C-alpha cells in the first residue's frame, strides 16, 4: 500500500519555513497510513487476528479446520467444510507494551490503549458443490501514542490506522478430495498521525489525517487425501492504497504553553509558513502465501500447522509527494517527494497447534509460533512500527451451547525477542531501545448456524 500527503498553503500564508525533508521525518509514522499494523500483532504492519478460534491455536491450520467461518479470510476453499447458512461475529483486543528508553534516560510507552480487531463472517451453501461467503475484517491496523515532548518525537509520536476489508468469496467442491475458492477484497483505510517537526531552531509538530479505497484478490485450494488429513494453500494479492489527506503543521507550544496547530501567533515575523496543506500518500501492501495442514490424530485430538510467507521485501521505502516540500524549503526547484527508507525483507510465520475435544460441548486448544520480523537492518526500525522477531504462546476454548450456537474464547502472549534498538538511520548510532515489545491478545466470538 501507499500513502501520500499533498499540501497547499493556508490562504494568506506566504511565509516560508527553512526546512526540507525534516518536515517529513513525520513519514515514519505515515508508513502505517497505507495499511498499518502494530509490530506486536504481526510482522510488518499486518494483522493476523481474524479468528478467535484460530487465536487459541496460534493460527495453525487457519482456514481448513472448519470450526468457525474464518475460511472466508484465510482460505476460501475451506468454506466447503461449513454446511448450511452460518453467521459469525467477534473481536480480539490487543494490549501492547512498548516500553522505550532513550540514551539520555527519557522514557515512554507507545501503548495507546486496548485496540479491538473485529471480525464478521457469513457463509451460505448454495448447493452440494458451491458456497458463498462474505467477510468484514480489519487486516491492517495499529495504535501507538508517545508524549509530545519525548526526546525522539521526530521518530513518531502518535499513530492510529485502521483498514476495513470487505471480502466476498465463492468456493467450489470439485470432488471429495479437492476444493478451490476465490474472492475480491475491497479495502478502506483511515489513518491519523502526529510527529515532531524541526522548524528552524524551534520544535514543531505535524498531524496527518488521510483515507482512501483500494482493492485486491485472494485464492485458495484445499486438498483432503484422507478423511482425517487436509492441506491448504492460500494467496492474497498486493493491495495499493492511494490516500488523500490533510496535514497540519504548527509549533509544539504556543505563547500560552498549549500545543497549537495552524499558524501560531509566535511565528509572526520569523518567515515561517505553518498551516494546513492537502496531501496524498501511496504505499504497497505485500503478497502473502500461506500453507496449512491439519490432522485428526484421534476422535478427540487434532494437530495443525501453518507456514506463512509475506513479501515485505517489496516495501523498500515510503514515498511522500507534496508541493509543500518546495514551499516550506523556499526553493521552487527542490524535490517535492520525500522517501522514508525501510529496506525490509520477506518475513515468515511458523506455528503449531492442538485441539482436544473433552466432550460434545467443550473443546480446548493451544499453540506456539515463531515470527521472523521483516526489519532487515535494525537502524531502519521506527518508533511507530517497532518490529522485531516474536514468540507466540496461545490458549483457547470452544463451548457448544447447543447444536446451533457456539462461543469461542482465546488468549495469546506475544514476546518480542532480538534487537529492539532505535537508531539514527544515517549514521547507525543507537538513540534508544525498547525494553519491551510485547502484547497480550484476548478474544471472544460466537458462531450461529441457521439450519
Where are these regions (language model features)?
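N-terminal, post-signal-peptide region of Sec/Tat-exported proteins
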Residues: 67-94
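Outer-membrane beta-barrel porins/channels
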Residues: 41-58, 62, 84, 100-107, ...
Amino acid at each position: 500500500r501507499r500513502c501520500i500527503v499533498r499540501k497547499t498553503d493556508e490562504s494568506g500564508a506566504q511565509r516560508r519555513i527553512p526546512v526540507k525533508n525534516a518536515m517529513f521525518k513525520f513519514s515514519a509514522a505515515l508508513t502505517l497510513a497505507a495499511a498499518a499494523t502494530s509490530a506486536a500483532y504481526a510482522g510488518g504492519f499486518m494483522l493476523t487476528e481474524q479468528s478467535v478460534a484460530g487465536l487459541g491455536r496460534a493460527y495453525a491450520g487457519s482456514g481448513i479446520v472448519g470450526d468457525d467461518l474464518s475460511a472466508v479470510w484465510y482460505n476460501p476453499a475451506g468454506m466447503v467444510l461449513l454446511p448450511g447458512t452460518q453467521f459469525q461475529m467477534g473481536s480480539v483486543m490487543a494490549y501492547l507494551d512498548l516500553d522505550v528508553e532513550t540514551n539520555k534516560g527519557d522514557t515512554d510507552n507507545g501503548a495507546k490503549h486496548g485496540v479491538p480487531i473485529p471480525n464478521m463472517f457469513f457463509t451460505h451453501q448454495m448447493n452440494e458443490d458451491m458456497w458463498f461467503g462474505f467477510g468484514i475484517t480489519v487486516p491492517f491496523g495499529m495504535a501507538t501514542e508517545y508524549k509530545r515532548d519525548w526526546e525522539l518525537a521526530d521518530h513518531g509520536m502518535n499513530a492510529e490506522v485502521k483498514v476495513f476489508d470487505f471480502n466476498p468469496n465463492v468456493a467450489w467442491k470439485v470432488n471429495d478430495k479437492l476444493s478451490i475458492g476465490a474472492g475480491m477484497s475491497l479495502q478502506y483505510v483511515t489513518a491519523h498521525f502526529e510527529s515532531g517537526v524541526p522548524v528552524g531552531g524551534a520544535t514543531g509538530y505535524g498531524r496527518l489525517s488521510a483515507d482512501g479505497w483500494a482493492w485486491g484478490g485472494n485464492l485458495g485450494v484445499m486438498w483432503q487425501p484422507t478423511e482425517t488429513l487436509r492441506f491448504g494453500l492460500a494467496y492474497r494479492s498486493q493491495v495499493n492504497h492511494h490516500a488523500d489527506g490533510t496535514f497540519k503543521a504548527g509549533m509544539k507550544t504556543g505563547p500560552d504553553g498549549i500545543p497549537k496547530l495552524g499558524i501560531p501567533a509566535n511565528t509572526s515575523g520569523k518567515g515561517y509558513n505553518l498551516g494546513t496543506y492537502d496531501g496524498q500518500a501511496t504505499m504497497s501492501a505485500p503478497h502473502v502465501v500461506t500453507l496449512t495442514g491439519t490432522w485428526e490424530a484421534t476422535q478427540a485430538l487434532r494437530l495443525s500447522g501453518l507456514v506463512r510467507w509475506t513479501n515485505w521485501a517489496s516495501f523498500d521505502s515510503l514515498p511522500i509527494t507534496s508541493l509543500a516540500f518546495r514551499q516550506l524549503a523556499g526553493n521552487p526547484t527542490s524535490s517535492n517527494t520525500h522517501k522514508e527508507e525501510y529496506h525490509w525483507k520477506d518475513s515468515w510465520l511458523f506455528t503449531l497447534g492442538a485441539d482436544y475435544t473433552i466432550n460434545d460441548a467443550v473443546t480446548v486448544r493451544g499453540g506456539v509460533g515463531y515470527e521472523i520480523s521483516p526489519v532487515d537492518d535494525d537502524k531502519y526500525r521506527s518508533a511507530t512500527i517497532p518490529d522485531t522477531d516474536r514468540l507466540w504462546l496461545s490458549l483457547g476454548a470452544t463451548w457448544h451451547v447447543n447444536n446451533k450456537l457456539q462461543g469461542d474464547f482465546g488468549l495469546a502472549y506475544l514476546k518480542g525477542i532480538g534487537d529492539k534498538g532505535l537508531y539514527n538511520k544515517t549514521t547507525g548510532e543507537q538513540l534508544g531501545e525498547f525494553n519491551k515489545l510485547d502484547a497480550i491478545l484476548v478474544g471472544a466470538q460466537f458462531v450461529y448456524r441457521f439450519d
